[in-house]
UniProtKB/Swiss-Prot annotation:
Cell inner membrane listed as a keyword: no
UniProt pathway: Metabolic intermediate biosynthesis; chorismate biosynthesis; chorismate from D-erythrose 4-phosphate and phosphoenolpyruvate: step 6/7
Species: Escherichia coli O1:K1 / APEC
GO biological process: amino acid biosynthetic process; aromatic amino acid family biosynthetic process; chorismate biosynthetic process
CDD domains reported for this sequence: EPT-like (cd01554)
GO cellular component: cytoplasm
Main location: cytoplasm
The protein's name: 3-phosphoshikimate 1-carboxyvinyltransferase
Similarity field: Belongs to the EPSP synthase family.
Cell compartment(s), UniProt: Cytoplasm
Amino acid sequence: MESLTLQPIARVDGTINLPGSKSVSNRALLLAALAHGKTVLTNLLDSDDVRHMLNALTALGVSYTLSADRTRCEIIGNGGPLHAESARELFLGNAGTAMRPLAAALCLGSNDIVLTGEPRMKERPIGHLVDALRQGGAKITYLEQENYPPLRLQGGFTGGNVDVDGSVSSQFLTALLMTAPLAPEDTVIRIKGDLVSKPYIDITLNLMKTFGVEIENQHYQQFVVKGGQSYQSPGTYLVEGDASSASYFLAAAAIRGGTVKVTGIGRNSMQGDIRFADVLEKMGATICWGDDYISCTRGELNAIDMDMNHIPDAAMTIATAALFAKGTTTLRNIYNWRVKETDRLFAMATELRKVGAEVEEGHDFIRITPPEKLKFAEIATYNDHRMAMCFSLVALSDTPVTILDPKCTAKTFPDYFEQLARISQPG
């Protein structure tokens, strides 16, 4: 297996221009494909997940052109639901941001299409979304294991009253919200259980509004969506930088700054993961906010005990930053780590112990006490981009670290290690 050994980093300093947000890129691509008119997306993320969405749109007859660096995309909207001319299978890798929204959108009208992906995708639950779509008339068949992809979709979603469980993934609600305006009837979506990752719903609502559709949000408990609507292209749309990707550089500065400035997001960003910077501030770093940047300057870091449900992806970065904080850090309400690219609670606990930390792994929390001195280890990454990026922070000590399968960062950030090297000074 390929590996990358990072030598100790004495200091980080500099500016990082963030790649486009994965969450925003894939939502914008789908809405542009469903909309009337031509949409030009700029600062689009070029990564595996986005390529899976683009390949699916091609198979569905959507025409688009990409710039040479794949960050500018001109899409000719379909002016309504997408149709596969003949029955076909779409392979979506391990891209939840493609699988969930497409599973809903392809239930409009009369399709016959199979959605499948990598082995890990077949372990990521989708039952709550399927249950909700079926309530609205969709005809969906599980082809292997009940409640998991691959799925056969045969259209039929017309709207109506739909209950959806929000306790596992906000992407199920996102998928329903984006699909419902194109259904023939009105849809009333009721949330069962606690809605996780609420800020990701705000991204969805914000983008839908950009494409001309507003819905009634009743305190995130119920959403009323008028049927028979259509999306309209906004013309040009700039994709924000990826706030989850920003977390690694901001944390690096908190640990070994200097100062690191990330551009492409700022105080008015629609991504909830910008709140990660508040957590670093609480730990003792200095944060400065601009309209188009966030900067972080080193501080003496102290442990925290916090509910991280609002920033589940960026919270992983706090787990490795905790290795550099004084005291025991507890991250709570993070059960949904278990249904991501890998079981991230298990993976994080296992790898933190390798570098010498004392770790308690609970059903929905993790507690981390750093060692006096970090140990050299080979870090398994579980084909999870965030594991690779999180554990790069171990090199900010006087101990090197080896990352196995470093190219797994291609899911969201193909040149992550080059960017980290650019702002790093060796120990």
